[in-house]
UniProtKB/Swiss-Prot annotation:
Organism: Crotalus durissus cumanensis
Tissue: Expressed by the venom gland.
Keywords annotated in UniProt: Antimicrobial, Disulfide bond, Ion channel impairing toxin, Myotoxin, Neurotoxin, Potassium channel impairing toxin, Secreted, Toxin, Voltage-gated potassium channel impairing toxin
Subunit and partners: Monomer.
Principal location listed in the UniProt entry: secreted
Identification of the protein by name: Crotamine-IV-2
Amino acid sequence: YKRCHIKGGHCFPKEKLICIPPSSDIGKMDCPWKRKCCKKRS
């Protein structure tokens, strides 16, 4: 998991990652707003 950066009011991932809702991956939020988390694209 890597940090995301806020842009345009949304959380966008760095490199080849995607941001998903916390509910999809509880406990692994790693964004500034703590509203979404980054997870590697499957």
